[in-house]
């Protein structure tokens, strides 16, 4: 995995972030989703590195990055704090302006990063998400059944943590299988499981979702009408919820003055691992056209 990439632990204000770096060209920050780590990009990063300097990072609380104590308001794991981490990471690495691509939770961090640090992001690609606020506001029985984990993981007093800790493999495997339509994830799944076998990281991931259901929505409502001015690409899984429940291009177009492009991919939720060649092509075409 990640042949030709170097590993780095980068010191930021509140701890260390883990990332892999490789390639050359305009920086492209890759952010992962749940229940994963930066490893989810292992099929795509080496090819993307032929055109870009790739920085594949673990979000705080995930993978090998820092775990921080939670707080009653869940602000520690807000997307604003996670986005600030990534800005500090890019500062330390010497990158001023950059592209960002985020899947799932990473897409939500990328969106907040682009909103809070408007002069830094050249263009953004988000994979299999619509904005958090839109998704919560559209919640109905169909959505709740498909995204049950959104409502399970936010439960208080450590209940979801205790249940996941009782059998981490069953939880990780069920997420990967259910959301991909039964695909095999090979050695990557072991990397995800290694992180999800640590109680403090299970708790951190729950805090990520608790923040999304609270303080993140406050932030999103506060600047909802402040449009971005960057191109956005949205890729969604043909067999997933996003395309069935939303009109992704239309939803994202309401967030930027620039063009939104994108399409459905022949996948479930885990697009970069289910269709790596397609993702490589789409990301290359999009970012190279805006460079």
Predicted regions and their residues:
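Conserved HGGG/HGGXW glycine-rich cap/lid loop of the alpha/beta-hydrolase fold
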Residues: 20-68
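Proline-centered flexible-loop/turn and helix-kink motifs
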Residues: 35, 50, 118-119, 257-258, ...
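Alpha/beta-hydrolase-fold serine-hydrolase catalytic core, especially in secreted/extracellular enzymes
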Residues: 199-200, 276, 290-291
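Catalytic histidine-centered segment of alpha/beta-hydrolase-like enzymes
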Residues: 268-276, 280
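Flexible "cap/lid" subdomain of the alpha/beta-hydrolase fold that forms the substrate-access gate
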Residues: 1-8, 14-17, 27, 55, ...
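Conserved donor-nucleotide binding/catalytic region of nucleotide-linked donor-dependent transferases
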Residues: 184-185, 289-291
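Surface-exposed alpha-helical interface segments used for non-catalytic interactions
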Residues: 39-42, 46, 84, 111, ...
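C-terminal alpha-helix
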Residues: 282-290
């Amino acid at each position: 995995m990640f042949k030709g990439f170097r590993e780095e632990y980068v010191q930021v204000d509140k701890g260390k972030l883990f990332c892999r770096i490789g390639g050359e060209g305009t920086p492209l920050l890759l952010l992962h989703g749940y229940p994963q780590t930066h490893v989810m990009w292992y099929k795509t990063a080496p090819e993307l590195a032929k055109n870009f300097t790739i920085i594949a990072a673990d979000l705080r609380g995930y993978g090998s990055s820092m775990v921080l104590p939670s707080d009653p308001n869940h602000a520690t794991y807000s997307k604003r704090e996670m986005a600030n981490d990534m800005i500090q990471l890019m500062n330390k690495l010497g990158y001023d302006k950059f592209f960002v691509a985020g899947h799932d939770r990473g897409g939500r961090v990328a969106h907040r990063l682009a909103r809070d640090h408007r002069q830094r992001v050249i263009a953004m690609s988000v994979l299999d998400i619509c904005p958090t606020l839109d998704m919560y506001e559209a919640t109905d029985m169909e959505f709740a059944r498909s995204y049950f984990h959104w409502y399970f993981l936010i439960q208080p007093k450590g209940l979801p943590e205790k249940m996941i800790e009782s059998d981490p493999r069953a939880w990780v495997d069920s997420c990967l299988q259910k959301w991909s339509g039964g695909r095999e994830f090979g050695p990557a799944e072991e990397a995800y499981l290694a992180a999800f076998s640590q109680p403090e990281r299970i708790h951190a991931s729950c805090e990520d979702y608790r923040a999304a259901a609270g303080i993140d929505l406050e932030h999103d409502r506060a600047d909802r009408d402040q449009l971005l001015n960057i191109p956005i690409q949205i890729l969604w899984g043909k067999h997933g919820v996003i395309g069935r429940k939303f009109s992704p291009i239309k939803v994202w177009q309401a967030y930027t003055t620039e063009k939104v492009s994108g399409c459905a991919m022949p996948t479930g939720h885990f697009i970069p691992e289910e269709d790596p060649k397609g993702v490589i092509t789409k990301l290359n075409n999009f970012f190279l056209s805006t460079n």
